[in-house]
């Protein structure tokens, strides 16, 4: 297993993949946001930033935590949902200002926790509200081979919610990593192409992530949330409350190894 150090992650760039698991965007009420985004068949809709080291705006806030989710400071109720994902750690190979390739070396449990904000101009507006907006497990699986018959073929992702009244609920549908629409080299090649060519526009929720990476100083590493799985009926309709515990787990069916993330939810005050 590979230890994930938060201090080290402060220099990494963070971004996510939208629409990489069939049905998730519809469950999250976000499919309409992508009406002006062209995509090919089952391909994801695009990529979005959630952490830009050195950025002067909200994306420059370091959002990752191993053990808690801090609710945004708001006078009105905000609907927050766990987004159970695989976090993929990659080395970035640059050719000038262009990302030539991404080299994966570890993966594990990641919570791309999101505020459901209707009509948000960009996906990133739902993703980073400051400290402990996002969750990452303390340990990842060490993997460089993402081929369908490789070492990740036996890995699955699940998600549970422990509510403050002591109940435990299945929040995300237990899914194989090979269930992602794009995975392995197909996903890495697609992401690299998007980093080079996705420019974003006013009529879509997407942004020029590649340009943000260049502005961040050509980071040597990235943490990529490769997409949230489908929700259970309870997960689709249940939002996080102070006192809850969110659990995201990437586990092996061939051994007892697991990358597990447990985050206690608390208010900022």
Please place each PLM-identified region on the residue numbering.
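Loop/turn positions that initiate beta-strands
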Residues: 219, 241-245
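Short, hydrophobic/aliphatic alpha-helical segments
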Residues: 1-10
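Short, charged beta-turn/beta-strand-edge "cap" motif at the junction between a beta-strand
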Residues: 22, 228-233, 251-256
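Glycine-rich beta-strand-to-loop/alpha-helix junction loops that act as flexible
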Residues: 17-19, 218-232
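Glycine-enriched loop-and-adjacent helix/strand subsegments that border the catalytic/binding cleft
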Residues: 9-214, 237-238, 261-269
